Amino acid sequence: MNLLIMGLPGAGKGTQAAKIVEKFKVAHISTGDMFRAAMANQTEMGVLAKSYIDKGELVPDEVTNGIVKERLSQEDIKETGFLLDGYPRTIDQAHALDAILKDLGIDLDGVINIEVDPSCLLERLSGRIIHRQTGETFHKVFNPPANYNEEDYYQREDDKPETVKRRLDVNIAQGEPILSHYREQNLVHDIQGNQDINDVFSDIEKVLEKLK
């Protein structure tokens, strides 16, 4: 079974990816892990990627796509299948993945898309606060401190509502063309992510049992 998992930041994609891998024994291929392994093993693409990273430059798409192809060419993929997590990030990468899979003779079986309303994600992601003295992390809504005094807490720049909204907007703009691309191929399975973690996974399980 060969799968992609998609979802906006905060939608619970990482949690569900781990559950899918545990239950269905597919290889979990995340972008970060792929890059680290390729660089550690000094593969052709790994060496190229490291040269860009060492200079503080963005790794170009052709190198990222090359690393994906190297990973999908490995023997374990034929036996277990895969769950791609964090790639493709752009429509160009989605087209590149189509070409890679065709070249390797691999069919994509499904795209799991975890849907959560962006306004819920904004609340979820921008509610994190940190105690100035202890460094303890709380959430204004879901895990508030017992005695909340605003002056005693701060927010990281990354967690401020305006920063979170910008990040969500970028992800939505990049993600919509990718989802449309896979919808045209009837591969997308939308999963309601605004429910209990186990209920989300139960919905995913029902989809994947049919794809097995």
Curated annotation (Swiss-Prot):
Task: Say which domain of life the source belongs to.
Answer: Bacteria
Classification via InterPro entries: Adenyl_kin_sub, Adenylat/UMP-CMP_kin, Adenylat_kinase_CS, ADK_active_lid_dom_sf, P-loop_NTPase
- The regions listed as transmembrane in this protein's record are none
Where do the record's region annotations for NMP lie?
30-59
Keywords of the record:
ATP-binding, Cytoplasm, Kinase, Nucleotide biosynthesis, Nucleotide-binding, Transferase
**One Pfam family this chain carries?**
ADK
Recorded catalytic reaction(s): these are: AMP + ATP = 2 ADP
Entries under CDD domains matching the protein: ADK (cd01428)
List locations, semicolon-separated.
Cytoplasm
Q: Where are the stretches annotated LID?
A: 127-159
- EC assignment: the record states 2.7.4.3
Please name the GO terms of the biological process aspect recorded for this protein, alphabetically: AMP salvage
- Where along this sequence does the record place binding of ATP? 10-15, 128, 137-138, 195
**Gene Ontology molecular function, alphabetical:** adenylate kinase activity; ATP binding
Would you identify the family this protein belongs to, as annotated? Belongs to the adenylate kinase family.
Anything noted about its domains?
Consists of three domains, a large central CORE domain and two small peripheral domains, NMPbind and LID, which undergo movements during catalysis. The LID domain closes over the site of phosphoryl transfer upon ATP binding. Assembling and dissambling the active center during each catalytic cycle provides an effective means to prevent ATP hydrolysis.
Q: What does this protein do?
A: Catalyzes the reversible transfer of the terminal phosphate group between ATP and AMP. Plays an important role in cellular energy homeostasis and in adenine nucleotide metabolism.
Q: What is this protein called?
A: Adenylate kinase
Organism from which the protein derives: Streptococcus gordonii (strain Challis / ATCC 35105 / BCRC 15272 / CH1 / DL1 / V288)
Name of encoding gene: adk
